[in-house]
Amino acid sequence: MKTRYFFLCFIIFFSCTQNNKTSQYLNIHSDVGYVGINTCKQCHMDIYSSFIETGMGKSFKTAKKKFSSSLFNHEIYDSILKFHYRPNWEGEKLVLDEYKIQNNDTIYSLKTEIDYIVGSGNHTNSHIISDNGYLSQAPFTFYTQDSILDCPPGFEHGNNTRYNRKIGLECMTCHNSFPHFTLGSENKYQNVPSGI
C-alpha cells in the first residue's frame, strides 16, 4: 500500500513540475505547412518587396522577355548529335528551333515553345518546357557572366539528352518554391509557383 501511495505521489509531483508553456511561435507544430510568399506579403510588404529583387526571388519565372537576361545572337551546335539550336523571341514567346542540316539542306526541324526561365540571371538562365504539366529542361542555357549561349551543365561532351532531362521534385524545390507535384510521377506538376 505504501508503495502505491509513494508511486501516486511521485506521479503527481512529477506532472506538477513539468513546464507546459506554449510557444508564441505557431510554425513549430507538425501540422503547420508552407504558406507561400503571398501570405507573408500581407504583413511583411517591405521584406517581400526587397526579397523579390534578390537572386532567390528571381529564381523561377515564366519565359517572358522582361525576365530573361539572355542574348540570343548565335546558335549552338552539338557536333556529336549534329543538332543546331537557335533560341529566339517571337513577340513575347521564347521558342527554340532545333534542326539538322545535311548537304546544305534542312533534314529535320522542330520548334518548341519555352515555358519557364530558371535562374535569376546573376549567373545563368536555363530553360524549362512544360508538356501538359510534365517539365523537362531545354537544351540551351545562357551564361550571363560570360555572355555565352551554350548547352546546359551536363549536356556537353556527348551527353545532350535534348528534351528528356526531367525536372523532378528535388530539382524544383531547390531552384523554386514548393510546387503542387503529382505523386507517383517523375516530373508532372499541377501548379508551379514563380520564385522562391
Segments (PLM) and residue ranges:
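Sequence context of c-type cytochrome heme-c attachment sites
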Residues: 19-38, 42-196
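Bacterial Sec-dependent N-terminal signal peptides
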Residues: 1-26
